[in-house]
């Protein structure tokens, strides 16, 4: 098991981010008035194409039966700094925590972190979420549990190298949580993603073909890859798990008032 420890400087930055959150993290997508009977949730993006936001928020609305207020937070610098450094640094952690703090102040009942590259940071904040009464869940957490329940040999597919390690660790944590041994392999399939969807899904299937032969199940590390899931599943004859549906389900389950 990997232990994630942050030095004192990190927590000083975290405290500063909580104090300055309203200045750092303006909310978009929030209703001016909120019906207390309608759940309010927050979504934190660090890479946010219009298609990704539409897919994530559509999945959330479907999970909640359309009755949900969604607060949206975006900060591309968190992803950029983390991907470049290969780890979560003080500044990116403080910015992320600032978004969480503003979501809590704004009345969110639970927070969904969409970026797989910062999955370790979202995981490390579970204790904060418990104390604050505003749980935070990573979009891949429940998907990784489903992968572990479905097979021992799990293949992680990603288009960004920075998404691989955190997703692998999420799977290993899920294995430990469920008491199951797992074997994780990875394939990074870059090139052309987002330009020609049809061409890319074929490229993705071919890049995964060899590794998929020895895998029980395939996990897409990034929710932005979800449109390719059906094609890859059909081409390779392997079950493919993709978000945002698992993240939406976990977000609803995390709400204190959900009773789940």
What do these predicted regions represent?
Residues 2-15:
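Bacterial N-terminal signal peptides that target proteins for export
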Residues 13-26:
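Bacterial N-terminal signal peptides
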Residues 27-31:
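Sec/Tat signal peptide C-region and signal peptidase I cleavage site
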Residues 32-260:
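Non-catalytic structural scaffold of enzyme domains
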